[in-house]
């Protein structure tokens, strides 16, 4: 399991499932928040992504600083970054720019609507 801080769990669940294509995994009520995870449909027994409520002031400052500096909170590997970029743009997802070479990858960053930039990248060399 890994996590990403989100400022709205309901909006995050919608974005990560309806736009990015994850599947809901766990949804356990915890007071006013939830233990809310999603998983890749390609590996439903694989790594879960916890949509963690961003309630601590230090976490909020960290998230805001990353976003302001254009740094993705996390990055997902894709087979074809250009196709994924076009697919997501057609769904209304906003990017900071078009895919561009970055070392041994081609990468792009999108706004997850929950306070984060999320990277997508395609490995071009090993």
Identify the function of each model-found stretch.
Residues 4-47:
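Core segments of cupin and vicinal oxygen chelate
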Residues 69-73:
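Eukaryotic phosphotyrosine signaling hubs
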């Amino acid at each position: 399991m890994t996590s990403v801080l989100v400022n709205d769990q309901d909006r995050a669940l919608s974005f990560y499932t309806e736009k990015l294509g994850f599947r809901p995994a766990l949804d356990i009520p915890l007071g006013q928040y939830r233990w809310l995870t999603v998983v890749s449909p390609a590996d439903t027994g694989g790594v879960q992504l916890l949509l963690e409520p961003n309630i601590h002031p230090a976490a909020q400052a960290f998230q805001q600083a990353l976003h302001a500096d254009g740094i993705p909170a996390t990055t997902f590997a894709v087979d074809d970054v250009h196709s994924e970029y076009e697919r997501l743009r057609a769904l209304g997802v906003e990017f900071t720019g078009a895919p561009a070479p970055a070392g041994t990858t081609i990468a792009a960053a999108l706004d997850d609507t929950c306070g984060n930039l999320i990277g997508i990248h395609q490995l071009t060399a090993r």
